[in-house]
């Protein structure tokens, strides 16, 4: 009986040891994606069809009144929840702790310490928008002025 218990324990330990040799595979959305034709985006509209891959694509006027297209991260800068776009109020509202963000991504209410991050965005020769989520831009560091963080329309 003792041998059965000993062999069972050693077999279990061997299985757990072998299990650690194989890493956990994490399925994540692609770091870059095609966001369609530039001309399909309407002014002052948030396109949430890419929310599942972690981005909103937006066409709006910036602080210098330029018509631009940019991609915002769907991650709240407070605790990482996903804000919702409230079309009637023209703002992003985080359901976790009430942070509010303007269409530009700038925080104006709640505990979020900084604006939403922008992703790198570019246009192909055919006018197709490519969003690259591996490159992020933060407003508080002055990175929103980088020409890779927006497209002029």
What residues fall within each predicted segment?
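Short, basic/low-complexity N-terminal boundary segments at the transition from targeting/disordered tails
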Residues: 103-106, 152
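Proline-rich low-complexity regions
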Residues: 23, 95, 111-113
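N-terminal pre-ligand scaffold of iron-sulfur
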Residues: 2-86, 119-153
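Membrane-embedded segments
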Residues: 73-75, 82-104, 115
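A sequence-level detector of short linear motifs
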Residues: 102, 109, 130-131
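Exported/periplasmic cell-wall-interacting domains
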Residues: 107-115, 124-125
